[in-house]
Amino acid sequence: METRYSAADIEAKWQQQWLELGLDKTPSQSDKPKFYALSMFPYPSGKLHMGHVRNYVITDVIARYKRMQGYRVLHPMGWDAFGLPAENAAIDRGIPPAKWTYQNIAQMREQLKQLGLSIDWDREVATCSPDYYKWTQWLFLQFYKAGLAYQKEAAVNWDPIDQTVLANEQVDAEGRSWRSGAIVEKKLLRQWFLKITDYAEELLQDLNTLDGWPERVKLMQENWIGKSTGAHLEFPVVGSDEKVAVFTTRLDTVFGVTYVVLAPEHPLVAQVTTPAQKAAVDAFIAEVSQESEQDRTADDKPKKGVATGGMVTNPFTGEEVPILIANYVLYEYGTGAVMGVPAHDSRDCKFAKENNLPIKMVIIPEGGDATAVLTEAYTEAGIMVNSGQFDGLVSTEGKKAIAKFAAENGFGREQIQYRLRDWLISRQRYWGCPIPMIYCDDCGVVPVPDSDLPVVLPEDVEFSARGGSPLAQMADWQAVDCPCCGKAARRETDTMDTFIDSSWYFLRYTDANNTEKPFALDPVNDWMAVDQYVGGIEHAILHLLYSRFFTKVVRDRQLVSVDEPFKRLLTQGMVQALTYKNPRTNKYVPADQVDPNDPKDPETGEPLTGFYEKMSKSKYNGVDPALVLDKYGADTARMFILFKAPPEKDLEWDDADVEGQFRFLNRIWNLVAGYEAAETSVKATGELSKAEKDLRRAVHTAIKEIQEDLEGDYQFNTAIAELMKLNNAIKDVKCVDSPVYKEAIETLILLLAPFAPHIADELWSNLGHSESIHTVPFPQLDETALTVDEITIVIQILGKTRGTIQVPAGISKADLEKTATASDIAQRYIAGKEIKKVIVVPNKLVNFVIPK
């Protein structure tokens, strides 16, 4: 055995041996229990970053541990390979998107292999491959056949930089595109949608079945689905047969309606606007069209409106109230209209005051004054007043009575509404999955026949600087015969939102090489659901909600039997690094140009502010994984990533701690090297000495603690701390010829194997084993080894610790008091003194109370 640990010498060797042995191949169906371990697959940017490393190492430890436990494990990897960066690279660098993407995949695949990940590369998928997106298109057609994919003209979120449409979820709280950062505009386009709203209630209710998900993620999805229970009401337009429909959760306040507001985009606006108000209304609509959805609805933004001149009748009171349009009402949400109750809604109250609209109080607190002048909205429940026949009812009773009254009179009904909107999937870009639809002048919209799939992206494409999709300019590619009538027709030129690709990839992994189907029933039902999914919290709504939706739809198409795709979800924290910024200029300064002991701006000499932030190029604080692997090896990088912080917490990069993990692996190496060099013959098993019992107890304590850490919340940091304790316990004993010592050494290496797989296999081999350590079962806990012959008892005098004694385990309370009283430590303080009281805490302490 080499006396010095060299990661460079052993890691490539073992990676090659694992490949030759096929250790990472997914076993076929058997009597063994299955475990599906999955990391969210990456976008192939071409370079691994530390966030990737953390994600994939966490999943790999789980996969390796489960294999050692006797599970057959599916641990695949692939590439979320469609998307704008490849298209922008074609524009900026003149490289075709496919070439750029596949080059990046090749680079990142090798980087991942260097980490020693136990991935079954035979199941690798790339969403940009026609072999994959053929089935993405096929699944889209399943949605279409089920009535879940449809077209409509809609005011959509338009990214003016990337020249494409965004889903609501892809616009941040400031109204900016999630990718380009541009202020999003509204634009009317005919688009494809998926009817996720058909599954809103099931998506909401099934969150209750996801016991293995973080509560935070479930709450985010619950809020996004946004279920509201209320009523649908119709206000007749004066002088017209039209009605303004509204949804309200405060039916008890309907007698306080003093105006109705339409969204500027509402189709009734043109009909209800009077000639006198047309100019003002048109100007207001033009002004609002320049505002983002977020600006229009944010609490801290002004709520602006203008009167249309039209009126509606409150069906409960017969009173006519004005119709206004306002920026804070969105046509895409609810009915696109709201009733204004300024006495009992803070936003309505502010809007009414600014527009000189009346305020009518109809709810008062119990014991309140119905004639009092309101200075601000009363928004709580209470007693109904000024509400005709419903006066005196409490809000809850009033809601029910009014709902019944409205239903009986034909102008309202109880209703459930969701904040969730249908999923807009059309994108005006090239590098995405083509939507498999055809437009025929005679037959209308026609699906591409299954036999003609995939609709393949053309390769001879010219790109202009972010000027929309080149597919729309390619007449030859668009030209196609109609599958129904055979006449000349044209292809759809939009491609799908890339979140479609990632909404089913976990299903494809179960049968990745099937050329006849996206996946067959036997393998998909064998492996699904994913037992452990690992990825970032940033995907809580988008990817995770869409994946749940897709799974439910394919279940209803009898393609899979599970209701939910992911049993357990671990959302790992970010990897942060020390970041420097000049507080005067607000500019980031590269960390490698700063002395951490005296941080100064290298250009100006000004003092810098140092703090931890997520690693990123723009902050000049990234750490290249390749440099860490070159210097220390993959095992050290893995150990640091796992030890530095619990997986769900943010991790702060620290070079000194990386060095610390390298030293720890060296200590284990030296321990095994010393044992091997001693060439000690192991003596026969006999009665164990105290030292042997103590060592065996340390071994099985480590097994117990590490197993609990890997079964529960994946506290890898405390598991590695147990490895350190065990290493120290072995180092401190001298019985190297004992079978217990050999058991301890081998157990230490077995426990290390999921965390640092290369060094573990090397040390296992050096101990004379011919098989890979990754084929050996996880150590079995022997509960009897945890029992102790003696325990330590603290002796206290007047509550102050004076020393400890050893007593037999299981000693009675009375015998413990006698033994403690007779001990030299106690006698030193109590001899010849009155003992007022003796407090005995079994297995812990004895406290003597004597006169001061």
Curated annotation (Swiss-Prot):
Subcellular location: Cytoplasm
Residue ranges annotated as motif 'HIGH' region: 42-52
Organism phylogeny: Bacteria, Bacillati, Cyanobacteriota, Cyanophyceae, Oscillatoriophycideae
Reaction equations catalysed: tRNA(Leu) + L-leucine + ATP = L-leucyl-tRNA(Leu) + AMP + diphosphate
GO process annotations (BP): leucyl-tRNA aminoacylation
UniProt entry tagged with the keyword rRNA processing: no
Pfam families: Anticodon_1, tRNA-synt_1, tRNA-synt_1_2, tRNA-synt_1g
Annotated EC: 6.1.1.4
Region Disordered, residue ranges: 586-606
Binding site for ATP: K617
TM helices/strands, residue ranges: none
Motif 'KMSKS' region location, chain numbering: 614-618
Protein known as: Leucine--tRNA ligase
EC class: ligase
A cellular-component GO term for this protein: cytosol
Gene Ontology molecular functions: aminoacyl-tRNA deacylase activity; ATP binding; leucine-tRNA ligase activity
Family: Belongs to the class-I aminoacyl-tRNA synthetase family.
Principal location class: cytoplasm
UniProt keyword list: Aminoacyl-tRNA synthetase, ATP-binding, Cytoplasm, Ligase, Nucleotide-binding, Protein biosynthesis
Signal peptide span: none
